[in-house]
Curated annotation (Swiss-Prot):
This is Non-structural protein 1. Upon interferon induction, ISGylated via host HERC5; this results in the impairment of NS1 interaction with RNA targets due to its inability to form homodimers and to interact with host EIF2AK2/PKR. Pfam families: Flu_NS1. Residues 180-215 are annotated as: CPSF4-binding. The keyword RNA-binding applies. Homodimer. Interacts with host TRIM25 (via coiled coil); this interaction specifically inhibits TRIM25 multimerization and TRIM25-mediated RIGI CARD ubiquitination. Interacts with human EIF2AK2/PKR, CPSF4, IVNS1ABP and PABPN1. Its main location: host cell. GO terms for cellular component: host cell cytoplasm; host cell nucleus. It comes from Influenza A virus (strain A/Herring gull/DE/677/1988 H2N8).
Length: 230
């Protein structure tokens, strides 16, 4: 195993531990707690892939961080932090909507890069809206936390989520995944709208009412794509 891969995992484990302590003291806001929960799943997946124990890695990560802090001057961290552009966290969904369990009568699933696309193909003739929580930087989507498809009644019928074991995706990856999800839902005569936040940062090819403009040929292609993988 590459030493940089191991040390990166160890530091990530320790920093997650620090953030968990902050959350335990009720000092974290909703985006902070949301990222904490997502990163926990990611670390578990990475730990399984690398064959490393998280508790042991956390202790090793603490030693690495302490050594770096001893070497740093007081001014260096301030300069580094000031030079890094800040990302913004945008939320369409509440914590309840993000954490709610949902079930599919006719489950369909596709893995596209580091994103997992899931939908219930038993849903027909419904009005559906796509909502997402994600971060943006330089007015572009930086990291998708979770995207879900809701009916007017509030039922969850589709989802796009990052795979914990495969971190990293681009805004183009997210846009392509949204296209696949929309194509699959519209194949069953559902009407799909995209939230204003998603329209602005992740899905720009839409009509004025927020409905995505996909030609019939592309809809059929996307539907066949997701039907071919369960």
């Amino acid at each position: 195993m590459d030493s940089n891969t191991m040390s990166s995992f160890q530091v990530d484990c320790f920093l997650w531990h620090v953030r968990k302590r902050i959350a335990d003291q009720e000092l974290g806001d909703a985006p902070f707690l949301d990222r904490l929960r997502r990163d926990q799943k990611s670390l578990r997946g990475r730990g399984n892939t690398l064959g490393l124990d998280i508790e042991t890695a956390t202790r090793a990560g603490k030693q690495i961080v302490e050594r770096i802090l001893e070497e740093e001057s007081d001014e260096a961290p301030k300069m580094t932090i000031a030079s890094v552009p800040a990302s913004r966290y945008l939320t369409d969904m509440t914590l309840e909507e993000m954490s709610r369990e949902w079930f599919m009568l006719m489950p369909k699933q596709k893995v596209a890069g580091s994103l997992c696309i899931r939908m219930d193909q038993a849903i027909m003739d419904k009005n559906i809206i796509l909502k997402a929580n994600f971060s943006v930087i330089f007015d572009r989507l930086e990291t998708l936390i979770l995207l879900r498809a809701f009916t007017e009644e509030g039922a969850i019928v589709g989802e796009i989520s990052p795979l914990p074991s495969l971190p990293g995706h681009t805004d183009e990856d997210v846009k392509n995944a949204i296209g696949v999800l929309i194509g699959g839902l519209e194949w069953n005569d559902n009407t799909v709208r995209v939230s204003e936040t998603l329209q602005r940062f992740a899905w720009r090819s839409s009509n004025e009412d927020g409905r995505p403009s996909l030609p019939p040929k592309q809809k059929r292609k996307m539907a066949r794509t997701i039907e071919s993988e369960v």
